[in-house]
Curated annotation (Swiss-Prot):
NCBIfam families: DTMP_kinase. This is Thymidylate kinase. The lineage of its organism: Bacteria, Bacillati, Chloroflexota, Chloroflexia, Herpetosiphonales. The gene is tmk. It catalyses: dTMP + ATP = dTDP + ADP. Keywords: ATP-binding, Kinase, Nucleotide biosynthesis, Nucleotide-binding, Transferase. It comes from Herpetosiphon aurantiacus (strain ATCC 23779 / DSM 785 / 114-95). ATP binds at G9, P10, E11, G12, S13, G14, K15, S16.
Length: 236
């Protein structure tokens, strides 16, 4: 047996951090586990990530954005996720197809039926076994992201640039991308879309308050994953 767990949530909810903590815990416990992310996770998907999230592409059409995310996802599923699941491992993914429904569907108003068809084509119908939703009020999450952005800029200014290496532009800041910069109303629609999806499929989704202390949230996630590990063989 294998296990496919995805992390979803508003911007700044701590998905990436908690996914790393869970990966480290499972690895130390002897489970075969990998952590990947969307968009990204392969050289091709990472190239798409740089394109689709770059702040300079303000004129990108919603349909173009949707198809780029789907292309990155197709590569990640085919190259990384499916092969590891077939080996009986645990795959943790920081965002997956639900992000498309939330952002391009509810956020940008793309047709949800069409998005489901695109997603089915890109993933071969692969669904997560479990999705952890880290919930946080939109403004609180964006405040966290702004702080991360500002800290990044400050540290970049303090560091001495190496003349033989290309220096990142502000648009390449992983802590603040083209989607982060959208208006509050967009992010509110995204969060509302997530909540609708959770209500429609409560067996797959587990909701956590991302506003609590980081250590407490980690403990809750570790407890939540335990019942799903009974069929996974450890490496030892």
């Amino acid at each position: 047996m294998s296990l496919f767990i995805t992390f979803e949530g508003p911007e700044g909810s701590g998905k990436s951090t908690q996914a790393r903590y869970l990966k480290d815990y499972l690895q130390q416990a002897g489970y075969p586990v990998i952590l990947t992310r969307e968009p990204g996770g392969t050289p091709i998907s990472d190239a798409v990530r740089r394109l689709v999230l770059d702040g300079q592409w303000t004129a990108m059409e919603p349909t173009t954005e949707t198809l780029l995310f789907a292309a990155a996802r197709a590569q990640l599923v085919g190259e990384v996720i499916l092969p590891y699941l077939k080996l009986g491992g645990i795959v943790l993914c920081d965002r997956y197809a639900d992000s498309t429904f939330a952002h391009q569907g509810y956020g940008l108003g793309r047709n949800l039926t069409e998005l489901r068809e695109i997603t089915r084509f890109a993933t071969g119908g692969l669904q997560p076994d479990l999705t952890f939703f880290l919930d946080l009020p939109v403004e609180q999450g964006l405040q966290r992201k702004r702080k991360q952005r500002d800290d990044f800029r400050e540290s970049s200014q303090l560091a001495l640039p190496l003349p033989h290496l290309p220096q990142p532009s502000p648009s390449q800041n992983e802590h603040w991308n083209r989607l982060d910069a959208r208006e509050i109303a967009y992010h509110e629609r995204v969060r509302s879309g997530y909540l609708e999806m959770i209500a429609a499929d409560p067996q797959r989704w587990q909701v956590f308050d991302a506003g609590i202390e980081r250590e407490s949230l980690t403990e809750q996630l570790l407890l939540a994953v335990q019942p799903h590990l009974t069929t996974i063989k450890t490496l030892s």
